[in-house]
Amino acid sequence: MSDNPRQAFSTPSDQWIDLYQIDLDQQNADLNILSDDERQRAEKHQSNHYAVMRTVMRSILGQLLHLGPSEVPIWIEDGGKPYLAGRNFEFNLSHTGRYGLLAISQLPLGVDIERFRPQANRLAIAKRVMPKDAIARIEAAEDSDHVFYQEWTQLEARHKCIGKGIFDQLDPAIELQYAQLELPSELMGCVAWPRQPTVPKLAYHMVT
């Protein structure tokens, strides 16, 4: 991973996308700072990873907003995308197993990470939700599992960027850019944002 010239907790910018990487097994959950809805959702999960992810998310956003974690004003769009009410930056998050990722920028954005695991039914999955060109790339690839996860994380990130589910049609008038992420070898990830005259830089931060 390249050297990072940007400090963690820098003021969000449209020139940067800050990516906070979290080992959920190394952090603690604090149910007291979660919303009622978050606590109810946490109770439905067998592991505490959801609660830890929301705890860390609120702690980071609170530090950027100069608010206590429980005071962070998180709202949910009709499509399910979280946003900060009345604030000038956006965030998106994803977690898989013990790994979490929180993306922050002044740009609208979507992020997805997945654990890399061989998928025997990858083509069947792809044909349900992916465009024909993505399916063709998977079929033609020597390492089709690798390409499947590239295409899947791109699909998720792009749809999350505009607050849509993966079965929803994307508006062709909305031009999106994306980048594959530099992550541990067992992970694949992607972040997407609306097309910009200047491509934003990615800054990686480890949460310890």
Label the model's feature ranges.
Residues 1-208:
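Core catalytic alpha/beta fold that binds nucleotide/phospho-ligands
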